[in-house]
Structure formats: structure tokens, C-alpha cells
Amino acid sequence: MHHEAPLYTWFGLTFNLANVLMITVTSVIVFVIAVLATRNLAMKPTGMQNFLEWVMDFVKGIIKSNMDWKTGGRFHMLGMTLIMYIFVANMLGLPFSVVIDNKLWWKSPTADPVVTLTLATMVVALSHYYGIKLNGFKEYAKGFVSPMPILFPLKIIEEFANTLTLGLRLYGNIFAGEILLALLAGSLATGVGGTIAAIIPTIAWQGFSIFVGAIQAFIFTMLTMVYMAHKVSHDH
């Protein structure tokens, strides 16, 4: 069933209130996790601190697989933020959705292309910023005309393609998962027969969606570091 988005117009700008709500919820959850994991730091980590250090090591491995740590270390916190934020965002729409007056209020924020394309645009923009900051504008500009100046139009197209594929890949996977979960939930509500037939596929798809959400958070973070490495390396 199609549900409308709760929209609000302010000074000529239209805001999706569901996106605002879910982005805020995701940010608060990630912030709380970070605070709980670091409020009582110990030399021998346990519990939440142990989990956060594992995430840090995991992201460090992603960065080191793409660039020298001396250069890539500055992107450690960016990678940490992205992988945790996107994973939490991907999970929010799995347990349930909230619909009030046919308006969808509770969902995964990454099930909206506006959110994922905004994240992708931010990542690509940051890669250009650090490309100029670390290599200088002249060296940065060379990347668009090497090995041959005739490739310049293709390089520009590549930048737009990177933004679209990075954002739409995340959106497509999460949105498709929520659509299927909604269909299965509808089957659960059709009666005893529908409930029995749909309960096992629903549980199975919930588990698979957790896996997909984790993989998509990893892929987004990995591609972020690939784009960063491409711009900050001296031989790009």
C-alpha cells in the first residue's frame, strides 16, 4: 500500500518531516552509542568499548586497503561515522513502520533517495576538497586531463556517475527490503492461513535484511575511501 510523505513548506522550501524525524533519531542513537562506549575508558576494554574499538579497527582496515595510513588516517572518524550512521539508519525500518492518517512517519531514512543522494554528494564533495587541500589545485586539475585531455568530458561524467551510483545503490537495496517486508506484513494480517504462510518468510527476510543493511553500510564506507584515495593520491 502506498503511503504519503508528511510534507511541510516553510519559506518556499518543502521538508519531508519523516526524513527529519528519522535522521534525528539515527543521529541520537549513534551519539548515545558513542557516549556509552567511551564514558568509562579502560586499558582492557569490555562491553561497548570493546565493540567500538572493533569498529575502529575494521574501518582502519578499510582505509589501509585503499591508501597509506599517513594520508588516510585523517578519514578515520569520517569512516566511523558513516558506517555506524548508515547501519543504524538501515535498521530502523526493519522492526516496524508507523503510519498515521496514511502518512508514513517511521521508516529507514536510507529508504529515501533524497537522504542517500545527499550522503553521496557530501562524500564526493569531500573527496574534491581534500584532493585540492592535499595536492594543490594544479595537481588536482591534472587528474581531469590525464592521461589525455580528450578524456575531460568523460571524467566529468564519471563524477556524476559516482554520486548517483553511490546514493542509488544504498537507496535501492533498503527501499526494496522495506517494500517486501510491507507485503509480507500485509499477508500476516489477512487471516490465520496468511499468517501461517507468511510468518517464516517474514522472519527469514528480517534476518536477511539485517545482513543487507550491514553489507550496504560497509560498501558505502569502502567506496567513500576508494573515492578519497583516488583524489588524494599523487598518481590519480
From Swiss-Prot:
Q: What's its membrane topology?
A: Multi-pass membrane protein
Q: Which UniProt keywords apply?
A: ATP synthesis, Cell membrane, CF(0), Hydrogen ion transport, Ion transport, Membrane, Transmembrane, Transmembrane helix, Transport
> Could you confirm whether the keyword Metal-binding appears in this record?
no
UniProt GO cellular component terms: plasma membrane; proton-transporting ATP synthase complex
Compartments where located: Cell membrane
**Ranges annotated as spanning the membrane:** 17-37, 80-100, 114-134, 179-199, 208-228
Gene Ontology molecular-function annotations: proton-transporting ATP synthase activity, rotational mechanism
Q: Which PROSITE patterns match?
A: ATPASE_A
Q: Kindly name one Pfam family recorded for this protein.
A: ATP-synt_A
Source superkingdom:
Bacteria
The record's listing under CDD domains reads: ATP-synt_Fo_a_6 (cd00310)
Protein function = Key component of the proton channel; it plays a direct role in the translocation of protons across the membrane.
PANTHER family recorded for this chain? ATP SYNTHASE SUBUNIT A, CHLOROPLASTIC
Q: How does it assemble?
A: F-type ATPases have 2 components, CF(1) - the catalytic core - and CF(0) - the membrane proton channel. CF(1) has five subunits: alpha(3), beta(3), gamma(1), delta(1), epsilon(1). CF(0) has three main subunits: a(1), b(2) and c(9-12). The alpha and beta chains form an alternating ring which encloses part of the gamma chain. CF(1) is attached to CF(0) by a central stalk formed by the gamma and epsilon chains, while a peripheral stalk is formed by the delta and b chains.
Family the UniProt entry places it in? Belongs to the ATPase A chain family.
Name recorded for this polypeptide: ATP synthase subunit a
Q: Which organism is it from?
A: Anoxybacillus flavithermus (strain DSM 21510 / WK1)
Tell me the name of the encoding gene.
atpB
